[in-house]
């Protein structure tokens, strides 16, 4: 009874490509309209003033201005809201 599988058969060797998620524009940065602010899965960050949300939950600037973050309490979860200050 073999206890090794033999040459050329392994169950390892798979990995997915990174999705490059995260904050792309930090607080205090100046951005133009259409700039991507955050790439995310789900809504860890919520859109605030002058910020739109895409179908994949990406947050983007609707107007030119400066990025600002604020903490909010929503349904016992601490979330952050992203605003663009003009």
Curated annotation (Swiss-Prot):
Region: Disordered, residue numbers: 1-24
GO biological process: translation
Keyword Transmembrane helix recorded: no
Coiled-coil residue spans: none
Annotated keywords: Ribonucleoprotein, Ribosomal protein
CC terms in the record's Gene Ontology section: cytosolic large ribosomal subunit
GO molecular function, one term: structural constituent of ribosome
PROSITE patterns, A to Z: RIBOSOMAL_L27 (PS00831)
Family from the record: Belongs to the bacterial ribosomal protein bL27 family.
Protein name: Large ribosomal subunit protein bL27
Native organism: Prochlorococcus marinus (strain AS9601)
Name of the encoding gene: rpmA
């Amino acid at each position: 009874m073999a206890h090794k599988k033999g040459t050329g058969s392994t169950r390892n060797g798979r990995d997915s490509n990174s999705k490059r998620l995260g904050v792309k524009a930090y607080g205090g940065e100046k951005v133009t309209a259409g700039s991507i602010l955050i790439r995310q899965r789900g809504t860890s960050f919520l859109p605030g003033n002058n910020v739109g949300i895409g179908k994949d939950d990406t947050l983007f600037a609707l107007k030119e201005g400066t990025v600002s973050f604020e903490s909010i309490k929503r349904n016992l979860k601490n979330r952050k809201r992203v605003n663009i200050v003009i």
